[in-house]
Amino acid sequence: MGKYEDTLEDIKQTFGIVPGFMKAIPKDVLMQDWPLMKKYQLGESKIPAKYREFIGLAISANIKCPYCSLMHTAMAVGNGATQDEMAEVAFLASYTARWSAMLHALQYNYDTFTKEVHQISEHAKKTARK
């Protein structure tokens, strides 16, 4: 088999199917992206799988991508996410966008904000639970 066929076989072994959207992209793109997706989205990494899916779900909510939301929700549940956790992710996703909108609407000075964030971060380091 050639590299493309090997990639398709690896996808099938991983997902049980080769999704049509993966066949629809250019072959060279799939051959390049699949190993990265498999390693960082599906494999062992420094971030546990469920948390990676939470990150993906929060991002997909903010970019309003129904495809991404569906995939990351299903994968989060498949990795043991509870309804309470999913609800918290939904809140956090909306909260980040909300505060971003407020800061932009206020036209809050970015240099001031940067200094304040550093102060907050230093305080968090000192008071973090060990």
Where are these regions (language model features)?
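Short Fe-S-cluster ligation motifs
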Residues: 91-109
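Short helix-capping/linker segments at secondary-structure and domain boundaries
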Residues: 64-68, 101-103, 111
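Amphipathic alpha-helical segments within well-ordered protein domains
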Residues: 38, 56, 73-77, 90
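Iron-sulfur (Fe-S) cluster-binding segments and ferredoxin-like electron-carrier domains
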Residues: 30-31, 71-85
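Short, thiol/selenol-centered motifs that function as redox-active sites or metal-ligating centers
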Residues: 55, 59-71
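Acidic, glycine/proline-rich low-complexity segments that act as flexible tails and inter-domain linkers
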Residues: 1-51, 104-130
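Beta-strand segments within the central parallel beta-sheet cores of soluble alpha/beta enzyme folds
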Residues: 85-91
